[in-house]
Amino acid sequence: GTRVAIYGDPEMVLGMLSLSLENGMYPVLVAPSCKTPAFREHAQERIDAMNLDCDVKIFEGLDFDAFNDAVKDAEPEILMGNSNGKYISQQMGVPLIRVGFPIHDRVGAQRILTMGYRGAMSMIDRITNTILEAKDIELEKKWLQNKSNDLQGSCCDRRSAHMQPH
């Protein structure tokens, strides 16, 4: 499964935690923006019910510097949360699925449906498309690197052939 870090408002984080667990993802980091009395208990119940093979770290009320460090340690493949995580996403080269509040760097974010059946299906589509895009980018980079190596090798082979005494 895909390793995901989820952060934001506690209610949204619990919802995205459930959605990701139910769809075979590994939530390696769960970070609600503030401490609430029952968050850890509710999150742990959901995690325990899935019998995961990975360690899930729950950090409540982290500032973004501490969150940044926690994300680096957890090594997720995807981030799920608000726009405030875009710099971490860019630094680490990890895709960000924007969900929750605030989303201030996208037009129409206030109309993104996340509640109910239609919202869950929409989120699953967004998650899946993000995973597919990340895999596409990874494969394209490998292909370009191989092409570059092939071109350098053939160029060097030709150059060395011309430099040989006849």
What are these model-derived regions, one by one?
Residues 1-166:
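An N-terminal assembly and electron-transfer interface module characteristic of large anaerobic redox
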